[in-house]
Every structure is written in structure tokens, then in C-alpha cells.
Amino acid sequence: MFEPVELNNNAIIKVIGIGGGGGNAVEYMVQEHIEGVEFFAINTDAQALRKIEVEQTIQIGSDITKGLGAGANPEIGRRAAEEDSDNLKSILKDADMVFIASGMGGGTGTGAAPIIAKISKKLGILTVAVVTKPFNFEGKKRMISAEQGVSELSKYVDSLIIIPNDKLIKVLSKGISLLDAFNTANNVLKGAVQGIAELITKPGLMNVDFADVRTVMSEMGYAMMGTGIASGDERAKEASKIAISSPLLEDINLSGAKGVLVNITSGLNMKLDEFETIGNTIRSFSSDNATVVIGTSLDTNMNDSLRVTIVATGIGTYNDIKHNNNTENHTSKHVPKNLENLQTKESPKYNNPKQHIYDTFNQQGITNKEMNYLDIPAFLRKKHK
């Protein structure tokens, strides 16, 4: 039986974007006006920090890099973070939860993210990382660097969510713009932060406090996160389907998830049977002994829409996932069988995952200069101004 819990408004959530890509991800979230969260951009590149529209920026490693960046060298990124560890500790110390956003494969993000995560964990902060892995065409060296960075990062975070950039090619519709494709990846981080922030800061019929969030996400290893929005008579089923599919994430098997955190956001018109539908979706993949925390957030701006955010944790270590997946795409077979055939009106871009953006590049005659833009080691490539 679910019991209402007193709302806790005191939890401090910080989102730390590391490197050029992580900074871009944080800037995107600032522009999306996520409430109840503090945002920081950390970089070795002074020029990148001057251009970014994030209020709180921190330059690291100025003595090592002279403000010129890490030159795609993770060792430089690591040393830069260690050089400014006291400063980093000061911005983290009062947080209850920290999200780390970074692209893996470059210099600053790959090298500094594990150091910052380590500092956060030593301070007793619930630490969650959302990172990307590079496109295959960015080269074997960058991919190896990314794998090493993720493996090191996984030692110091409570939960880890990975977005392989190649999924943007395999999943999204043919002809989608580059900006929209990268913004779709950015929405994974936004969904996780927004869903958890709303759970503990917005009133609802079933309130959740930060202790519940910590129970589900602490020391859980690999995680899956998804958000779905739908409207109409089947909105609960459709939103759950979208949330649980998470086609942009590293391929994982949800069966046996040890922790599940769910936020349902709607207006005042949510029905009991809709709540049951979402609950049955959770039961379809979680372990019988899983810790399940469900909260609702009221938002009158949702009108007829309903949003479901699901964070499933305790799915295994990063090395377990890497060993099981290799390069094969298993996404569809990991959706619970009772949801596999459901078609949704809200997610037409997922209907044909075999369409390739790369085909569009070839058809449109993308130049070498434009392809070099894709090779920028960033979480999201900054749009040209």
C-alpha cells in the first residue's frame, strides 16, 4: 500500500556540466527553465566558458592549460580537476544530489568527470552521471578513451546513464536536423533532472521526499531513464511505453531492476485506472524485491497530457552491460512483451529505427568541413551563432 509522505522542500540539486559538451547540455537545460535546480559549467577552456549562457562557471587547470583547453587529452583534464579540487569541493559541499553531464572521449570531460564524481561521493552526496559516447566514425582512439573514462567514472557514481551518439543515427527519423537530433539526446538529461526535481519540490497527491530518491538511486550502478508524454484515452499506457523504451540509451535488459523511481505529472484529472496502468508497467520489468517509489506532481499547464518519468536502477555494473551488449542493438527485445506492439501517436520518430541519418548526409552532399563539426568532442555540438 502506498502512503503519502511529507513533502521536503530542502533538498539541494546541482547539475554540473563538465567540458564543452557538458556545458552545452547544462546551457540547454537553463534555456528550458528547469526549476529547483542549480546549474554549473566547468571547463579548462576559458573562451568556451565566456560564451556559454550559464550563470555559474568554473575554470579549472588554469596553471596547466593556460585557459586553452585539454587538447583531447584526458590526463590533462584529470590533472586540471585535481589542481582545483578545493574549489570544486566548495561548490559541491552543500548539495544533496549532483548530476554530472559530460561527453566521453575528449579531454576535459573524460578526465575531470571521474575526479569531480569522486569528490562528490566523498562528501556523501547522491551522485548520478549522464554521459555520451562518441560516434563510431570519430575513430577507435576516441572510443577507447571514452570507454576508459566511463569505466573510471562508474567507480564513483551511484547511478550511471549512458547515451551512445550512434543511437541518434540508428533511432531517429531520416532527415532530422542535427540540432534536433542532439537536442533529443539532451532531453534525456533534462527528463532525469526535471522528473526528480518535480518529485521532491512540487506538491502532489502522493509526495516523495529526498530520502526515497536516495534509497532508489544510491549505490545502484547502471541505470535506465525515460520520459513519455501522451494525451487522450490511452495516455497512461502510451506515456509508459515511451518512457520504458528509452531507445537512445545504451542497450540494457530491464528485467530484475532493483530500484524504480516513478514520477507521474498531470493536471487534476488523473484517474485511478491510469495509475494502475502505470503501476502494472513497472511490475512487468522490476524485480519482486525491488524498491519502488511512485510520486505524483500536479501541473495545471499539462491540460489533457500526462507525463511519466521512470528511473530504473540496479541493472548491473558498466562492465556487465558492455560485455553483454558488444555492438548489437537489443533495444526492442528489452521492452516488456505486453508493451512491444503498442503504437503511440506521440512518438512517430521511433516507428522505424532502421532509418539512418547518415544516409541523409550522403544524399545531401555533406562536406568534409561539416563532418569535422560532428567530430567536435562534445555532449552536444553547439549551434553556430
UniProtKB/Swiss-Prot annotation:
Alphabetized PROSITE patterns for the sequence: FTSZ_1, FTSZ_2
Function: Essential cell division protein that forms a contractile ring structure (Z ring) at the future cell division site. The regulation of the ring assembly controls the timing and the location of cell division. One of the functions of the FtsZ ring is to recruit other cell division proteins to the septum to produce a new cell wall between the dividing cells. Binds GTP and shows GTPase activity.
Keyword Cell division: yes
Native species: Buchnera aphidicola subsp. Baizongia pistaciae (strain Bp)
Family matches, as PANTHER family: CELL DIVISION PROTEIN FTSZ-RELATED, MITOCHONDRIAL DIVISION PROTEIN FSZA
Location(s) in or outside the cell: Cytoplasm
Cellular component terms (Gene Ontology): cell division site; cytoplasm
Entry keyword Transmembrane helix: no
Assembly information from the UniProt record: Homodimer. Polymerizes to form a dynamic ring structure in a strictly GTP-dependent manner. Interacts directly with several other division proteins.
Primary location recorded for the protein, binned into one broad class: cytoplasm
One protein family per Pfam: Tubulin
Molecular function via GO: GTP binding; GTPase activity
Stated family: Belongs to the FtsZ family.
Binding locations of GTP: G20, G21, G22, G23, N24, G107, T108, G109, E138, R142, N186
Keywords: Cell cycle, Cell division, Cytoplasm, GTP-binding, Nucleotide-binding, Septation
GO biological process: division septum assembly; FtsZ-dependent cytokinesis; protein polymerization
HAMAP family (UniProt xref): FtsZ
Name of the featured protein: Cell division protein FtsZ
